[in-house]
Amino acid sequence: MISHRFKHILPGIAFFAYLNVLPVAIHAESGDSQVLIPGGEYNLGSYYCEEEQSNADWCNDEALRKVKIGPFWIDKYEVSNADYRECFIAGVCEPAVLHEDRPKDFNKPRQPVVFVSWEDARTYCAWRGGELPTEAQWEAAAQGKKLGGAYFAQPYGTGAPEDTGKFTANSNGLYDMMGNVYEWT
């Protein structure tokens, strides 16, 4: 989730291999659960797709371009099953397909929630006092403080959702920005 100190935004709601997933909510009040991303100019798009592998199956980005954004706060972690369950128990969020046929590998409390639609992700963010980040905000947060080039130094994942925070944080102090699951914006 991301925020402008007054307004929170969730860093994304995700899907993993055609499954929808949701990241963790942020609260500006609890300083250690969020990171401030400074405003400024950021590159939006992928250097890798633009310069090296424009024919790669996953390269669906628009042309690389500069965007200007203001400062915002974003959660350090993706929304876990346990986080999303609180919203469901409060009667605000729809169930995240909590059926017996859901693979047990997707049910662990600390794993990112899956089977959540974009609308459900927005509802969750609003319940937490925030909103989803824009694509530009998410990319600025994911890029970290590294300038230029691709960001493949981060571990990409293991082929199945892992507990939130399992992989090393990027230079902004955000976890699981590459790999694990994709994010809604």
Regions found by a protein language model. Give the residues of each.
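Short, compositionally biased
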Residues: 1-94, 118-119
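Functional-site microenvironments in short loops/helix caps that host divalent-cation chemistry
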Residues: 36-37, 43-57, 94, 100-185
